[in-house]
Amino acid sequence: MKKIQRFFCYGLLAIGMIFAACGPDARLDLVGNIIGSAPRTDVRFVDSEKYNAEHPFVTIKAPVENYRVYVCTDTHITTDFYNWQNFISAYRADLLCPVALHLGDIVDASNHYPDVVNSFNQIPHNPLKPDTMMLVAGNHDICFSQWDEYLENYKTSVYYFIVETPLGQKDLFIMYDSADGTLGKKQLQWMRNTLEWASKQNFRHIVAGSHTHFFMRDNSQGIATNYSIEETYTLLRLFQSHGIDILFTGHSHSREVTMFDELTCIIVDSMTDEDKKPAYLVATIGEKIDYKFVNLPTKP
């Protein structure tokens, strides 16, 4: 029995070492052989850019100078969407919220995008305000052969948009694809170009949103889709040096707030119906950015 236990432990250790030694693309290939195909980052970036080329980035009008943005992540929707619909109801009822963000892992496995769309449409729209939801893909949205489903429903996972206040203040929101733990060469160049352009504009704030976080203080997700140390350093320095104020991410299903110089990095809680403490974030964006976490009631 002890020999079997040792063999099992050594096997897990070997798999972990292989994952740690591989780059993100190689990890994705290995995972894909087990749970279904997932196109690499550069391929997904090209798919997103095809849509972006025909659909200009949008400007959303905020109702007030100090507006609110609702942020959720990791809904992992199957046929249950209690927390998801509570979130939709909350942001649609808030007249100061012109836009909401979903940071990925929208669905849990294949064939559940219809459940996402139907449950979204079941909540009445508020005719007194804009109703915009901006999303990016997470690792569950690209594996299990789901990238095509994501594209069919949400079109792009790399883009930016602008929120403009009544007095003409403009805030830039950059949404990027980190679903397999790397931006890839093409998207990294896009990010550099976008931030160089942004530095020449007069944006009040720059906000970024994506699925995978930079810092991990627990091992709940193992090493799934984490950045390499080198890419973490590159992106942190790029974001900090180009004036990104705050970065919203998900993935680890655990709340965390980390400061890197003037850059605030926030991991937002997950919002699955199975969570014991599901929550989302509400950011108030004015001359400064404040935020609070909102705990959801657990599913009855």
Where are these predicted regions, by residue range?
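Hydrophobic beta-strand anchors of alpha/beta hydrolase catalytic cores
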Residues: 69, 100, 173, 206-207
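C-terminal motif of bacterial Sec signal peptides marking the signal peptidase cleavage site
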Residues: 19-21
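Extended active-site neighborhood of metal-dependent phosphoesterases/phosphodiesterases
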Residues: 34-54, 112-204, 225, 231-240, ...
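Short acidic, glycine-rich surface-loop motifs adjacent to enzyme active sites
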Residues: 198-219
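Bacterial N-terminal signal peptides that target proteins for export
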Residues: 2-11
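Histidine-centered catalytic micro-motifs
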Residues: 207-214, 245-255
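Active-site glycine-centered loops adjacent to acidic/histidine catalytic or metal-binding residues
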Residues: 74, 104-105, 138-139, 211, ...
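N-terminal active-site segment of His-dependent metallophosphoesterases
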Residues: 25-114
